[in-house]
């Protein structure tokens, strides 16, 4: 039987001592509960319904108080299915908000919104729990220094660098390498920063969540034989779960990440897939609670709910939480209130391109569409900024010339444009990189490339020093020295074929 951290953690008085109420009304996932006078629970308190249904099966439903209605009644939203509940059933006020296990014991495990393990690996050996509703760090605790969060991925570090303690939007459809990019980031932060990661699956497909778990085990991000050596904790609230669970699962994942930042003083990577589903679940709950909808049917508290989640993701003097959030854009409408509210919080955007993926260039990050507020001379320095701008200019010129090349051919271009195209094609291939987590699939050893090495490599291509090397030499290599070595190998192979 699963142990609920909210009701079983140390310091929580036994259920018999708590105030009890009765279910008055059930409308889908929303319960109205009547309590004795003077015994009303607070907003966000967890309520538990423990009973037997008509089929003689055990019911254990946790709810969260959302409204105080008057006449000793409260309205709560269920975190699991309300099947089998009946009016008149007893409801226990736990006297505290939902609390979840935190710390090293959560690594390598899968949890639901209540912090209960759902991976059949037994209970979690963690005495520490945190409530999921917490305040954002105080102004005095925030680290205001703007610093780059080095990922070891060339295209990200050079053209759309991440901010330490920042928020990044990850835009990508199915099959363009989003999962592999996520796993590589989890792997690299563990190796380069000694950090850990938390993955929050908010309203995602159960199949995708299972696939991610299996791929993480295959690539070593989750160490099945020695679970303590795993680098990530997973928290899932899938599409089939009630809106209350999908609305709160992001906070559960964030709470686990906050412990690593505040207590263990680590750099944490927090993935939220998908932030749109968080908004969507909030919209459903808002309608169920009877609030008047706002623009496009969204909840009137959209900005407040988004802000309360996003403001907790910050860099403090103890450590940092850097968040990468997958953003679904409904009907590709960027003015839709859900993505528009999300954009206001983002420091960088990483756009994955199907066109690049079809060319076999991985990671398929679009170098022209991806942006970052960190790419400024005063933050990254003149050398980095100028190199990035020249790379973008070269790629942009190549993009403009592609139509002419398709119609008239490469020979019709001027000498200068032919040189630009040759360098752009080398740059495009040099932006690809072998990943550690893809070693088992590709047979190529993964590469972590430091920022200084990345800048040096692109400067050499732009300066024309490597014009004599074939473009294949730049494909799927780490630093620029490997490209030179690969060119020699390719030349020897060609000679031996002749």
From Swiss-Prot:
The keyword ATP-binding applies. Its EC number is 7.1.2.2. It catalyses: ATP + H2O + 4 H(+)(in) = ADP + phosphate + 5 H(+)(out). ATP binds at residues 172-179. One of its GO terms (cellular component) is chloroplast thylakoid membrane. It is an enzyme of class 7 (translocase). It comes from the Eukaryota. GO terms for molecular function: ATP binding; ATP hydrolysis activity; proton-transporting ATP synthase activity, rotational mechanism. It is a peripheral membrane protein. GO terms for biological process: proton motive force-driven mitochondrial ATP synthesis. InterPro entries: AAA+_ATPase, ATP-synt_VA_C, ATP_synth_F1_bsu, ATPase_a/bsu_AS, ATPase_alpha/beta_chains, ATPase_F1/V1/A1_a/bsu_N, ATPase_F1/V1/A1_a/bsu_N_sf, ATPase_F1/V1/A1_a/bsu_nucl-bd. The keyword Nucleus does not apply. Keywords: ATP synthesis, ATP-binding, CF(1), Chloroplast, Hydrogen ion transport, Ion transport, Membrane, Nucleotide-binding, Plastid, Thylakoid, Translocase, Transport. It is found in: Plastid, Chloroplast thylakoid membrane. F-type ATPases have 2 components, CF(1) - the catalytic core - and CF(0) - the membrane proton channel. CF(1) has five subunits: alpha(3), beta(3), gamma(1), delta(1), epsilon(1). CF(0) has four main subunits: a(1), b(1), b'(1) and c(9-12). Belongs to the ATPase alpha/beta chains family. Produces ATP from ADP in the presence of a proton gradient across the membrane. The catalytic sites are hosted primarily by the beta subunits. This is ATP synthase subunit beta, chloroplastic.
């Amino acid at each position: 039987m699963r142990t609920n951290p909210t009701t079983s953690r140390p310091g929580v008085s036994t259920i018999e001592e708590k105030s009890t109420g009765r279910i008055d009304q059930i409308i889908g996932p929303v319960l109205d509960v009547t309590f004795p006078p003077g015994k009303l629970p607070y907003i966000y308190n967890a309520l538990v319904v423990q009973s037997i249904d008509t089929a003689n099966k055990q019911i254990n439903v946790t709810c969260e108080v959302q409204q105080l209605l008057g006449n000793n009644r409260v309205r709560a939203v269920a975190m699991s299915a309300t099947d089998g509940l009946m009016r008149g059933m007893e409801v226990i006020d736990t006297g505290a908000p939902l609390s979840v296990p935190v710390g090293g014991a959560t690594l390598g495990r899968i949890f639901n919104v209540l912090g209960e393990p759902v991976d059949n690996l037994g209970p979690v050996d963690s005495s520490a729990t945190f409530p999921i509703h917490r305040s954002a760090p105080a102004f005095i605790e925030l680290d205001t220094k703007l610093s780059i969060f080095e990922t070891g991925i060339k295209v990200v570090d050079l053209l759309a660098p991440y901010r330490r303690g920042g928020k990044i939007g990850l835009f990508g459809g199915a099959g363009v390498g989003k999962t592999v990019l996520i796993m590589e980031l989890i792997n690299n932060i563990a190796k380069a920063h000694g950090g850990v990661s938390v993955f929050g699956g908010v309203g995602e497909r159960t199949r995708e969540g299972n696939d991610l778990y299996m791929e993480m085990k295959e690539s070593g991000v989750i160490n099945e034989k020695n679970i303590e050596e795993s680098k990530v904790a997973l928290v899932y609230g899938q599409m089939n779960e009630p809106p209350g669970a999908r609305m709160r699962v992001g906070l559960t994942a964030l709470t686990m990440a906050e412990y690593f930042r505040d207590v263990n003083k680590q750099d944490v990577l927090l993935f939220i897939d998908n932030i749109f589903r968080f908004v969507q679940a909030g919209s459903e709950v808002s309608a169920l609670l009877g609030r008047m909808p706002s623009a496009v049917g969204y909840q009137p508290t959209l900005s407040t709910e988004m802000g309360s989640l996003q403001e907790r993701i910050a860099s403090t003097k103890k450590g940092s939480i850097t968040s990468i959030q997958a953003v679904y854009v409904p009907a590709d409408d960027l003015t839709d209130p859900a993505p528009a509210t999300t954009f206001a919080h983002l420091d960088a955007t990483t756009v994955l391109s199907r066109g690049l993926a079809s060319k076999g260039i991985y990671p398929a990050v679009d170098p022209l569409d991806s942006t970052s507020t960190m790419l400024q001379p005063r933050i990254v320095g003149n050398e980095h900024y100028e190199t990035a701008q020249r790379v973008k200019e070269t790629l942009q010129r190549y993009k403009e010339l592609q139509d002419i090349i398709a119609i008239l051919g490469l020979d019709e271009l001027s000498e200068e444009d032919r040189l630009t195209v040759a360098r752009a094609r080398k740059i495009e291939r040099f932006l690809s990189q072998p990943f550690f987590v893809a070693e088992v699939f590709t047979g190529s050893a993964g590469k972590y490339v430091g920022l200084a090495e990345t800048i040096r490599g692109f400067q050499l291509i732009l300066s024309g020093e490597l014009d004599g090397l074939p473009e294949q030499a730049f494909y799927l290599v780490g630093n620029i020295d490997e490209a030179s070595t690969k060119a020699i190998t390719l030349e020897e192979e060609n000679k031996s074929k002749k």
